[in-house]
Regions:
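Glycine-aromatic micro-motifs
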Residues: 2-157
Length: 157
């Protein structure tokens, strides 16, 4: 699969701009917009994890210049504990189709990288976050919800 045409990340947890890791991005994005993917969302305590599922998950799309993608991928892989050469990762990087609000308030689709839980067994004991918001006319889940514990420092993770 060709990934050279992808210049965006979909994030849904501590990498969002107003959260703990939102300031760790190595490059400045061209824009940040709301978007949703089809996925289930789980609360792992101080951060969430997504897994393939039937619900919709609300997050942010961070779009970059193509020239900024390699260093951004390298840094985010490190932050998310993903190494494509290792078997026991916490997360795995995948390509997703994201729906955003496009021109004239019409839904628009784009492809982006996103990190998903690499160890589904961990999710068996995690709290599933149910949809509680609406985006593009459909119910969506989002992190944090009213029961989530949001870390304010790295020592709280």
């Amino acid at each position: 699969m060709n990934t050279n045409d992808i210049s965006a990340f979909f994030v849904y947890g501590t990498l969002k701009k107003s959260y703990l890791r939102g300031g760790l991005w190595p490059r400045k994005p061209l824009r940040i917009v709301a978007g949703a993917i089809q996925s289930d969302l789980y609360d792992l305590g101080p951060y969430p994890a997504a897994a393939p599922g039937k619900h919709w998950l609300l997050g942010e799309i961070w779009e970059f210049n193509y020239a900024d993608m390699d260093p951004t991928i390298a840094e985010l892989d490190l932050i998310e504990g993903y190494n494509p050469l290792r078997e026991n990762n916490e997360y795995t990087r995948q390509i997703v189709t994201v729906e955003i609000l496009g021109p004239e308030s019409r839904p628009q689709k784009l492809r982006a990288f996103a990190y998903f839980a690499a160890q589904p067994k961990r999710l068996e004991v995690a709290r599933k976050i149910k949809p509680f918001l609406e985006f593009l006319g459909r119910p969506v889940a989002a992190w944090p919800d009213a029961s989530s514990r949001v870390p304010s420092s790295f020592s709280e993770e």
